[in-house]
Each structure stands twice: as structure tokens, then as C-alpha cells.
Amino acid sequence: MLQKKLKFWYDKKQGVFPCFLSFRKHPGPSGRERLTYALGRVVKERNTHDRQPGSRLFGKMKILKTEERKRDRMAENREMTIEICCGSYEDALAAARGGAERIELNSALALGGLTPSAACLRMVKRCTDLLVVSMVRPRGAGFCYTEAQTEQMFEEARELMENGSDGLAFGFLTEDRCVDLEKTGRMTELIHSYGREAVFHRAFDCTEDPVRAIEELIGLGADRILTSGQQEKAEQGKELLRQLQAAYGSRIQLLAGSGVNAGNARALAEYTGIRQLHSSCRYWERDVTTVGEGVNYSIAPAPHERDYDRVSERLVRELAEAFRER
């Protein structure tokens, strides 16, 4: 590996401070070389295909964290971690203030969570220190996608990672409710080519055989699975969660979610042995313009037909405190 450093001074509105520009050249995936350079706490990476006679040099830039910081935060993920399901920039701010380490960033939570905008992701990364796992999901309902929908997902995946997402949550199933090995393998490989985490979301809970599914995901190199133990709520699925953690917890991260709150987090973690919990920490906010004369834009039934859901900073803090009392 070749490394060069150049010290210089950088002028910001807040003042002048010393920093360095470093260059690293080392082997990358698929026989490519990877050139990285770092300025302060921001790292940019350029992947270049090997030159062939008469070929052009292709490359792309993407914003990354420093390698040391990333290693530190990835180590934290293997410890006790609270992940908050967020549907907006505002939700992410509440999660950060409440003490969350990581969020799953979505849009359209009323549909189970769809792909967030790149603008929302950039705002979260700019204004918080949260690890962000971005949802990649083009529509509501299930997880068996057409070719056009799949193409959209891969395009969105690249955009999200190029805008700083620390990982992606996704799920591909076949019509017989098995993991789609081809699409899942391609997505996992793409995510890992950016050095990010590949998270298979609760599509796992719709699979016909969870043992077969988790073994296939391990074989494909997935980093983590979000699951409720194939039940509506994680408490109801705690037996399967416990079994999966005991059998596979050393080979893949398990993240327990659905119905997790301050009242049950500690008991759920102790019973299952799972050290990562996923929660919405939701409360309802009224928007009186939701229902008009003959028009109704409600996303929830009564008594919340004029409400939308938000992340509660208080509930996040209570969850974090309860979980860390273990």
C-alpha cells in the first residue's frame, strides 16, 4: 500500500486549523485499485478500473467516514445498540437527542417504510453523528419485485451510499417466499463494494423457512437481519429469536424489532441474548388539515385519523436507559 501525506492549513469561518491530505493506494474489489484521500474527518474514495489498452479510466467519488471512526462504530454495533426507525429528518434529530446510536431512515412509514430521499439523508449526516441505515424499498406490500422495480432499487442504493449512508436495509423474496439468492447476492456485493453494511429487513419474517433463510443470508455475506421472530411483535416471536441467536449469533448480527419499548426491552434482550434492538418510539401529532369536506388523507384509523406519527425524544431516552441497565 502506498501512502503519502501533505500537511497544510485550512481556513474556515470558525477559524484556521492544521490538517493533512493523505493518499492511499491499495487493492480493491474485483481486481480494481482503490485510491483514497482524506481531509480532516472527511474521506473521499475513488474506485478506478484497471487500464486496458485503448480503454478509458472510469471513477466515481463518494463521501465516507474515516476508517478509524468507522471501525470504532462498527465495534459498537456488536455491543448493545438501539436503532430507531425514522421517517424524516425531524425524526432523526429526535432520535439523536434521545441517545440513539443508529437509525433506519425511511420515507412513508405508513406503508412500512420506503426509500428516503438523498436530500433527507444528507441533512441527517450533516447535522447528527448517527449511523444511518437507509431503507431501499420502492413500494408497499411484499418483497417480490419486477425487473423495473429491482433496477430502481439498485439505482437508489448507489445514490444513498454515494450520499453517505452507512448501510442499506433491503429484502428480496421469490414467489414461493424464499430468499431471492440472485438479487440478494447482487445487492450485498454492491453494498460491500462501498464498504457499507448489508441489512436484510423484515422480509425475513415472511420467509417460509427461517432456518434455511438465515443460512442462505449468511452464505451470501449479509451483515445483519432485522426480525420479529416471524410474529407481529418481537415479544410474540421471542422463542424463535432466542433459537436463532443461539445457533447463528456468532455468524450474523440479529436485530430484534416490532413492538419494542422501554417496558419490554430489557427482558427481551436478556431472554433472547440479542444485543441490538429496533424501535419506532412513536407518538402521534395532530394535523387538523388531514380531513376536509368530503376529502380524507388519514394514514391511521380512529382515534388517530387526523394524526401522523413522529419519533419521541422522550421515548427514545427511556428505551436507551432501560436497555443499558442490563
Q: What do these predicted ranges mean?
A:
Residues 76-87, 137-152, 173, 199-209:
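Active-site mouth loops of central-metabolism enzymes
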Residues 80-84, 103-105, 132-136, 168-170, ...:
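Hydrophobic faces of well-ordered beta-strands that scaffold small-molecule active sites
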Residues 90, 109-128, 174-191, 207-212, ...:
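Active-site-adjacent beta->alpha loops and helix N-cap segments on the catalytic face
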Residues 90-94, 145-156, 208-219, 260-275, ...:
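Catalytic cores of alpha/beta
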Residues 98-103, 128-130, 164-167, 193-195, ...:
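Glycine-enriched alpha-helix->loop->beta-strand junction motifs that scaffold or abut catalytic
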Residues 104-113, 159, 163, 169-175, ...:
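Glycine-rich phosphate-binding active-site loops on the catalytic face of alpha/beta enzymes
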Residues 124, 130-184:
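Glycine/small-residue-rich loop that forms an oxyanion/phosphate-binding "nest" at active or ligand-binding sites
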Residues 140, 248-326:
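C-terminal alpha-helical cap/extension of soluble enzyme domains
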